[in-house]
Amino acid sequence: MFGEAGKTKFQIDLRQHLRDQNISDNLVHLICEIAEASKYVINAIRTGDLGVAGTSNLYGEEQLALDVLSDRIIRKRLQHSGVVCNIASEEMEEIFQVTSNPQGMFSVAYDPLDGSSLVDVNLAVGTIVGIYQGSDLLQPGRHMVGAMYILYGPRVSMVYSVGKGVYEFTMNQLMEFTLSREQIQMHPSGDIYSPGGLRKKYCEGNERFIRYLEAKGSKLRYSGGFVPDINQVLIKGKGVFMYPALTDSPNGKLRLLFELNPMAFLIEQAGGAATNGHMPILDIVPESLDQRCPIYLGCRDDVVKAAEFLNTPCKTPHEEPQP
């Protein structure tokens, strides 16, 4: 008689749902434009060139042809939306100013195809987007007016928030996004963990946190793709993702502006937490487009516990933390 918890009984399309959220027509239009771009990105993933592009991004990483194409698809959509003034992409060296619309209401930071190196082995990848009011992109993530990711897996799904809860939409056979989960919420604590980075390079506090998770029976679930790993933690509502500081990379690997802020926004909206181990991710003031940051995000109690281990010296060399 009753549908599955968190599912919607009747099909609701994305534009209709956004209008029901009582947000501005311009923000509705922008989110729908990004969703529309994803249809072309998934087509490129399924049919496009998997080779290298012969170029590098601002981090010195070799760009794949799919990176470049996905970036172009999304940037063109944003550029012609009529509501965006500044665009920052992980694949671009500097902010792209929309000269045709310098008075645009929003600025957008995005990773066009996170995990693109996984495409050739047919693993899930995704697009990550953060939306800010006005022209300033170097502001704390807490100032975002919207965040979303699109997961290109066995199904294409979009998870978004405009500060009024977290919703999931799934692409149907007509390539339309329809509501599939409403008001996604995380449990206080979970039983899965997704740890990035080489374990032998973890600091002492992070190693103790891992042993704590193992002792309480948490299961390791890590694909190497940021979007699918966060999606698992968020949709299951019971886990923690981390990419910590490493001995040779004290600032971690993931980018604050393009990856961490949007995901932290979504996780907090679902009742979870996100920290660099010392302060909430969303309170960090970015100093540059390419700023990196350690990250712990997921169930609130687990994230708090991670910070405790990181900020509490070990009492004895061989002390095993208790769950």
From Swiss-Prot:
One Gene Ontology molecular-function label: magnesium ion binding
Whichever gene encodes this chain, its name is fbp
Q: Write down the InterPro entries for this protein, in alphabetical order.
A: FBPase_C_dom, FBPase_class-1, FBPase_N, FBPtase, Fructose_bisphosphatase_AS, SBPase
Pfam families from the UniProt entry: FBPase, FBPase_C
- Keyword entries, A-Z: Carbohydrate metabolism, Cytoplasm, Hydrolase, Magnesium, Metal-binding
Q: Which cofactor does it need?
A: Mg(2+)
How is the cofactor bound here?
Binds 2 magnesium ions per subunit.
**So what family is this one in?**
Belongs to the FBPase class 1 family.
Put simply, this protein is called: Fructose-1,6-bisphosphatase class 1
Q: Which residues bind Mg(2+) 2?
A: 111, 114, 259
What organism does the record attribute this protein to?
Answer: Pelobacter propionicus (strain DSM 2379 / NBRC 103807 / OttBd1)
Disulphide-bonded residues? none
Q: Assembly and interactions? A: Homotetramer.
What processes does the entry annotate via GO biological process terms? fructose 1,6-bisphosphate metabolic process; fructose 6-phosphate metabolic process; fructose metabolic process; gluconeogenesis; sucrose biosynthetic process
Q: Which reaction does it catalyse?
A: beta-D-fructose 1,6-bisphosphate + H2O = beta-D-fructose 6-phosphate + phosphate
Source domain of life is Bacteria
Task: Look up the record and name the pathway of this protein.
Answer: Carbohydrate biosynthesis; gluconeogenesis
Specify the taxonomic lineage. Bacteria, Pseudomonadati, Thermodesulfobacteriota, Desulfuromonadia, Desulfuromonadales
